[in-house]
UniProtKB/Swiss-Prot annotation:
The lineage of its organism: Bacteria, Pseudomonadati, Pseudomonadota, Gammaproteobacteria, Methylococcales. It comes from Methylococcus capsulatus (strain ATCC 33009 / NCIMB 11132 / Bath). Keywords: Amino-acid biosynthesis, Isomerase, Methionine biosynthesis. The record marks C162 as: Transition state stabilizer. GO terms for molecular function: S-methyl-5-thioribose-1-phosphate isomerase activity. This is Methylthioribose-1-phosphate isomerase.
């Protein structure tokens, strides 16, 4: 699929491959500035992931796949006989960029499998493998959009958290893809988006994406979610996932667990939307998921950063929502309602 085909689906693209390297839309600058930066090394792509220039579990995996291509290109040019050894080092660097998003490790393993069979110049075959990962994610997004829209039906309002659209994926979106598909069916009146502190992905990215598609949206403070639910304005909370355990527990952006608890109290349903690659079948429950914690300086006012300050900050960027609080998990392989070890095992059978 060409970049033109990707743009036909989404008004924005987080990632674009060019002969010079990987073009990354710097999401830290949105919505004020739309700036693409070109990265031509695997280490550069790893830094782009770690610094959150690119973010969202599927997009992280796609970026890492292209990072392997860049690493292989440089390694083969330096030493055609031993390039694979150097690329393994690049894969290790990419794997350390973000610990929670399982799509990262899934994509790197796909690229490692493609690399194993290559003799000679690795770039054509590895670039084809990276493009397949990118294209497959877009196809999965479109499929999930239709499956999720069929569940939402004639929904008056939905609440979403963080950013799960084209900026976070190969195009179109996971949770935001469901919202897009529901809107295009004429079956949704309004989207509510949390600001999603501390990086404000909802305030900066989600409402910007919705505005690009002319979908009516209302931004609210994270702390206003309970009051919104009590008002009856929303019937569903629709979110993405960075990792789903084999029992249906879900790791997602910090605040998702709070929304799940609030939704259950107010009779609002919770839908999780993620590609099947986000399910980590080797992780039994959410208790086994490593939750990333970022620099406290992302939260603290400069006044409290001095060496003599007694003020600290705790900055986990994900939390884990128990399967018991989730009404539906939507993947391109099928939908699981009321997820449990048994229903997730059935999904695994479909995905094979």
């Amino acid at each position: 699929m060409s970049d033109h085909s990707f743009s036909a689906v989404s008004a924005v693209q987080a990632l674009k491959w060019s002969d010079g390297g990987l073009e990354v839309l710097d999401q830290r600058l949105l919505p004020g500035d739309v700036v693409y930066q070109i990265f031509d090394t695997a280490a550069g792509v790893a830094e782009a992931i770690a610094s959150m220039r690119v973010r969202g579990a599927p997009a992280i995996g796609i970026a890492a796949a292209y990072g392997v291509v860049l690493g292989a290109r440089a390694a083969y040019a330096r030493d055609p006989a031993h390039w694979k050894r150097a690329v393994e080092d690049d894969i290790a660097v990419l794997a350390r960029s973000r610990p929670t998003a399982v799509n990262l490790f899934w994509a790197l393993e796909r690229m490692r499998e493609a690399m194993a069979a290559i003799e000679g110049d690795p770039v054509p075959a590895l670039l084809a493998a990276a493009r397949r990962i990118h294209e497959d994610d877009l196809a999965a997004n479109l499929a999930m959009g239709e499956l999720g829209a069929a569940i939402l039906g004639g929904c008056k309002g939905v609440l979403t958290h963080c950013n799960t659209g084209a900026l976070a994926t190969g195009g179109y979106g996971t949770a935001l893809g469901v919202i897009r598909s529901t809107w295009r069916r004429g079956a949704l009146e309004r989207v509510y988006a949390t600001e999603t502190r501390p990086w404000s992905q909802g305030a900066r990215l989600t409402v910007w994406e919705l505005g690009q598609d002319r979908i009516p949206a209302t931004l609210l403070a994270d702390s206003a979610a309970a009051w919104l639910m009590k008002s009856g304005a929303v019937q569903w909370v629709v979110v993405g996932a960075d990792r789903i355990a084999a029992n249906g527990d879900v790791a997602n952006k910090i605040g998702t667990y709070s929304l799940a608890v609030l939704a259950r109290h107010h009779g609002v349903k919770l839908m999780v939307v993620a590609p099947i690659s986000t399910v980590d079948w080797a992780t039994a429950t959410g208790e086994d998921i490593v939750v990333e914690e970022r620099d406290p300086r992302e939260l603290l006012h400069p006044l409290f950063l001095g060496s003599d300050s007694v003020i600290g900050a705790w900055n986990p960027v994900f939390d884990v929502t128990p399967a018991a609080l989730i009404d539906a998990i939507v993947t391109e392989a099928g939908v699981v309602t009321n997820p449990s070890p048994d229903t997730m095992a059935t999904l695994r059978g479909k995905a094979r």
